[in-house]
């Protein structure tokens, strides 16, 4: 039902190409996952998403628990049927919301007490509840409940979050009993190498079908993220997928892949699209700028997505300036396609034996700009 095969390795880096088999289809790695927090990738329909080449998306346990509630989703036949997406889905456990909504919660060893931001009611999220919600949602991959510490944080605070995350992982494993759903553990440790290494050892000891590196992209410098990945990735089991949470820039993706990471997610492509920004050749173009008013070329002349095939920079500029919703959708479609295309190009380079020359280390003026 769930398996992972490594099909090709780079001879000079840790980069690899693999295939993750799930009940709803295969995921070819390295793979970028668009974020569909509430069961929708903002502004993009499932059909449009499929045409970008996306193979798996991420949804969020915490937000779906609040609205519409896992009972409604379960009654509909599970999250895939509820949202009309018949491809793999990974659900995050809600641990990141412990970090991002810190003023609204109280954390102890039992779990997290939330004040519902919608109606002010008091809610509790524990490892057991988080896993039960994910089993009801019916995702292909569930994430263990974890505590994501903020940045910066003291050594003692991060150590406490690590110990709690490891305890919550044990409890998540104990309650999880859905045979057609894989459970991944999450490594924490902030920017402290010794805590990261210890967390990697502990989480790896549970022999799970996949492991994520969490607690990144919470405000720390990009170089710190790359340092964490270099430290942690070699400690992880070889034969399972490795998932770096919350990463989406081309440089970070390439560095992570060179260190043996397989899966990624980030809200960046759709967030930028909703603000009128397009990703083109690793750069960010603000389509509001007057320079695009009379520019009748495709948005990205090297891209074959529906946006670039059918629409010009001038038209997109017009839509954004006119505050037409279609403009935000078209930019989001392109931005997702941009990241999917980049990860696929890295996979081809690994198979062709030229990844280290083309992508690692990825530089803004490197050949990577011209080969994918």
Curated annotation (Swiss-Prot):
Pathway: tRNA modification; tRNA-queuosine biosynthesis. It catalyses: 7-aminomethyl-7-carbaguanine + guanosine(34) in tRNA = 7-aminomethyl-7-carbaguanosine(34) in tRNA + guanine. One of its GO terms (biological process) is queuosine biosynthetic process. InterPro entries: ArchSynthase1/Queuine_TRR, TGT, TGT-like_sf, tRNA_ribo_trans-like. The active site is at 92 (proton acceptor), 265 (nucleophile). Residues 246-252, 270-274 are annotated as: RNA binding. One of its GO terms (cellular component) is cytosol. SUPFAM superfamilies: tRNA-guanine transglycosylase. Keywords: Glycosyltransferase, Metal-binding, Queuosine biosynthesis, Transferase, tRNA processing, Zinc. Substrate binds at residues 92-96, 146, 188, 215. Binds 1 zinc ion per subunit. Its EC number is 2.4.2.29. GO terms for molecular function: metal ion binding; tRNA-guanosine(34) queuine transglycosylase activity. Its cofactor is Zn(2+). Belongs to the queuine tRNA-ribosyltransferase family. This is Queuine tRNA-ribosyltransferase. It comes from Prochlorococcus marinus (strain MIT 9211). The gene is tgt.
């Amino acid at each position: 039902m769930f398996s992972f095969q490594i099909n090709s390795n780079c001879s000079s880096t840790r980069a690899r190409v693999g295939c993750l088999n799930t009940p709803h289809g295969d995921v070819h790695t390295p793979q970028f996952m668009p974020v569909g927090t509430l069961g929708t990738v903002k502004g993009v329909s499932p059909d449009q998403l499929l045409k970008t080449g996306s193979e798996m998306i991420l949804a969020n346990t915490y937000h779906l628990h609040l609205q519409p509630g896992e009972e409604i989703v379960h009654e509909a036949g599970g999250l895939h049927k509820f949202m009309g997406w018949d491809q793999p889905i990974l659900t995050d456990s809600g641990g990141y919301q412990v970090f991002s909504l810190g003023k609204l919660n109280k954390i102890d060893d039992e779990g997290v007490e939330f004040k519902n931001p919608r109606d002010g009611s008091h809610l509790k999220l524990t490892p057991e509840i988080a896993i039960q919600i994910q089993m009801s949602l019916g995702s292909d991959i569930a994430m263990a409940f974890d505590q994501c510490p903020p940045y910066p944080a003291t050594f003692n605070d991060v150590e406490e979050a690590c110990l709690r995350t490891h305890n919550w992982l044990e409890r998540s494993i104990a309650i999880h009993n859905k045979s057609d759903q894989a459970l991944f553990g999450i490594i924490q440790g902030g920017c402290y190498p010794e805590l990261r290494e210890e967390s990697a050892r502990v989480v790896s000891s549970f022999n799970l079908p996949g492991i994520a590196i969490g607690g990144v992209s919470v405000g720390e410098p990009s170089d710190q993220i790359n340092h964490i990945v270099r430290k942690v990735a070699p400690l992880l089991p070889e034969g399972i997928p490795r998932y770096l949470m919350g990463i989406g820039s081309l440089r970070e993706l390439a560095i992570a892949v060179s260190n043996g990471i397989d899966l990624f997610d980030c809200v960046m492509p759709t967030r930028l699209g909703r603000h009128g920004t397009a990703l083109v050749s690793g750069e960010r173009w603000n389509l509001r700028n007057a320079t695009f008013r009379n520019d009748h070329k495709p948005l990205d002349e090297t891209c074959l997505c529906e946006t670039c095939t059918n629409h010009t920079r001038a038209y997109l500029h017009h839509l954004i300036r006119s505050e037409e919703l279609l403009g935000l959708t078209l930019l989001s479609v392109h931005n997702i396609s941009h990241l999917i295309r980049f990860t696929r190009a890295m996979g081809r380079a690994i198979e062709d034996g030229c990844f280290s020359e083309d992508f690692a280390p990825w530089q803004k003026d490197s050949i990577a700009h011209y080969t994918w």
